[in-house]
Amino acid sequence: MNNKKLKSKFIFITGGVVSSLGKGITAASIGNILKNRGFKVSIQKLDPYINIDPGTMSPYQHGEVFVTNDGAETDLDLGHYERFLDENMSKSSNITAGQIYQSVINKEREGKYLGKTVQVIPHITEEIKKKIIKAAIVHQSDIVIVEIGGTVGDIESAPFLEAIRQFRYEVGYHNVLYLHTTLVPYLKKAQEIKTKPTQHSVKELRALGIQPQILVLRSEISINKEIKNKIASLCDINPQAIFEALDVDILYQIILNLFEQRIDHFILNHFQLPNNIQIDLKDWRSLINCIQNLKEKVVIGLVGKYVILHDAYLSIVESLKHAAYYYNSDIEIKWIDSEKLNSTNVKTLLNDCDGILVPHGFGPRAIEGKILAIQYAREQKIPFFGICFGMQLAVVEYARNVLFLDGANSTEIDEKTPHPVITKKIKNSNLGGTLRLGSYRCCLQKNSKSEAIYQQTTIYERHRHRFEMNPSYVSLFEKNNDFLVSGFNPEKNLAEIIELKNHPWFMAVQFHPEFLSRPLKPHPLFKSFVEAALLKNGKNIKKSKLS
């Protein structure tokens, strides 16, 4: 590995004791603080699973697939990274074991190892290190934060941990920092904090040759100085380098909690970087203050097929929250399983919703429930927002119930439909890598609701779809002067946005606007949708101080 020209610093974040400790949130929070200190920060996630990417994984297994501008299908943690940092990630920001092994095997087939026996060490570990270096170069980062997926001790993580162990030796002590997150359980019955799991986790990490310089302790109660000193002594760590990550009601509070513990000072001192810029994170303080003092409440019905696992729609939920906070409003997501929605209960389930959102999805299961929800929103004049598959089904619903095209459908659902209003252009037997992915241009119709919302005529949005509105049906839809294709991609002439002129707020988009929404910069479509939902029942529209 050639590191002579490498100027980036690297923070490697590992986790111990249990999974789902919040390593991604810790990484994003530290990144936010360091960015506010004036450094160019990027974050990378190393996932130890053998899948090439999460694109073909079940939402029930993995949650949301987050799509980057350059078309990578990635872990949902990248959504946290982008929202906390307000920086775009890339394909180099999420590396899986599958990608690493595929790359090494391809090189072996091409003869690039000159007949050597290909092994985990050095070939797999070298490939991992190259991917880390590439992320630093692609993003031109001063500081790269690298989150290692999984838990220390998992067999899948072993090559990644060995690679980051070697990394410090090759780039230098003051260019690498190891941060370990662990759970510190609190036994309520005994009213006692237990440190043994943390001790064992650090011991296991040290046995792999990695001595963490920072510990971040996840706990439901504050950890006193005596406990921290005990952990420091037994884990051979500076007591000043032990920080706590308390359970919080507001996710963004973690940024302030770590900042107030001065974690950035310890990091910058270790890296021997300038540490004289004073910051106060006032925008984030204002956001948290706003969330703690919300005046109104809006109810959004989210009609989906994966609602059992809310993480399947994580970015949509966060985007709705961003927009609601912009209007000084709390938000209640009413989770509605489209498989259980039918003509006898649709009114009961949707009547109290201020707005209805039908999100993405794949396959024929539970689509009729979604179509019923769309019809109800259209006929009852309830603000409606369709995203990706939600747009496609809005087209199907309109074709069936307004244009009376009997049997109209998507060819994804019915290949023999007499009216294929939604079709697929790319035909491939494999599911992986065949989607239209990444950021594409969309031109907006002048004097349309879309143009009014965006306040511009050309936008770029991220996509993840295989099917699209059939161009040969567009003129038929627009004949009745209600249905409007208000956004289209000029390169492929694809319908990107539809809206109904005679409805208070009925819009559906082929792209995924939720991937571009930020806590301090809500996406314009979500803002407009939430505003319409608030207005539906005459609720007070008052922008927060964030606007």
Curated annotation (Swiss-Prot):
InterPro entries: Class_I_gatase-like, CTP_synthase, CTP_synthase_N, GATASE, GATase1_CTP_Synthase, P-loop_NTPase. L-glutamine binds at Y60, G361, F389, G390, M391, Q392, E412, R466. Its EC number is 6.3.4.2. The keyword ATP-binding applies. GO terms for molecular function: ATP binding; CTP synthase activity; glutaminase activity; identical protein binding; metal ion binding. GO terms for cellular component: cytosol. ATP binds at S20, L21, G22, K23, G24, I25, D77. Allosterically activated by GTP, when glutamine is the substrate; GTP has no effect on the reaction when ammonia is the substrate. The allosteric effector GTP functions by stabilizing the protein conformation that binds the tetrahedral intermediate(s) formed during glutamine hydrolysis. Inhibited by the product CTP, via allosteric rather than competitive inhibition. The keyword Magnesium applies. Residues 306-539 form the Glutamine amidotransferase type-1 domain. Mg(2+) binds at D77, E147. Pathway: Pyrimidine metabolism; CTP biosynthesis via de novo pathway; CTP from UDP: step 2/2. It holds the Pfam family CTP_synth_N. It catalyses: UTP + L-glutamine + ATP + H2O = CTP + L-glutamate + ADP + phosphate + 2 H(+); L-glutamine + H2O = L-glutamate + NH4(+); UTP + NH4(+) + ATP = CTP + ADP + phosphate + 2 H(+). CTP binds at S19, D154, I155, E156, K194, T195, K196, P197, T198, Q199, K230. GO terms for biological process: 'de novo' CTP biosynthetic process; pyrimidine nucleobase biosynthetic process. Keywords: ATP-binding, Glutamine amidotransferase, Ligase, Magnesium, Metal-binding, Nucleotide-binding, Pyrimidine biosynthesis. Residues 1-273 are annotated as: Amidoligase domain. The active site is at C388, H512, E514. PANTHER family: CTP SYNTHASE, CTP SYNTHASE-RELATED. Belongs to the CTP synthase family. HAMAP family: PyrG. Catalyzes the ATP-dependent amination of UTP to CTP with either L-glutamine or ammonia as the source of nitrogen. Regulates intracellular CTP levels through interactions with the four ribonucleotide triphosphates. Homotetramer. CTPSs have evolved a hybrid strategy for distinguishing between UTP and CTP. The overlapping regions of the product feedback inhibitory and substrate sites recognize a common feature in both compounds, the triphosphate moiety. To differentiate isosteric substrate and product pyrimidine rings, an additional pocket far from the expected kinase/ligase catalytic site, specifically recognizes the cytosine and ribose portions of the product inhibitor. This is CTP synthase. It comes from Phytoplasma australiense.
